[in-house]
């Protein structure tokens, strides 16, 4: 009986240590998500693109996009006077995988963007980001952004 109780205590201690480890991973991940979203909302191009893994895949506007081309387009839009005026995330759901180094974050996005000619566009969308801890840093390995049609 003592062996069983001792084994049970060892298992429970292991789970406790894993929970503490995942707690710090979860805090780091939430900080990365918040910083990534804030960088986009404030037109901080380099911080925003710094969160993408080198081989990340992104999908928006109905097609897979090249991250380098996306970076160039966004930089050019900022230099020409365009930019994001609003990018609010809501209903954030984060699922940290048991391994602790992969997570899926989903949220609704309310966006308002100004083109260089001053035209304002608004969108409501659903975004899914797949994050992976690479060399100790959380990076986006895949992002899928889908517009939600407005109800008129």
Residue locations for each model-derived region?
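N-terminal signal peptide c-region/cleavage motif recognized by signal peptidases
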Residues: 14-16
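Short beta-strand edge/turn micro-motifs at domain boundaries
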Residues: 124-151
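A solvent-exposed, acidic/Ser-Thr-rich amphipathic alpha-helical stretch
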Residues: 23-32, 45-101, 108, 122
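Beta-strand elements of well-folded, non-transmembrane domains
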Residues: 111-115, 131
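Short beta-strand segments enriched in hydrophobic/aromatic residues
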Residues: 52, 109-111, 144-147
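Short helix-adjacent coil turns
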Residues: 36, 43-44
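Sec-dependent signal peptide recognition
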Residues: 2-10
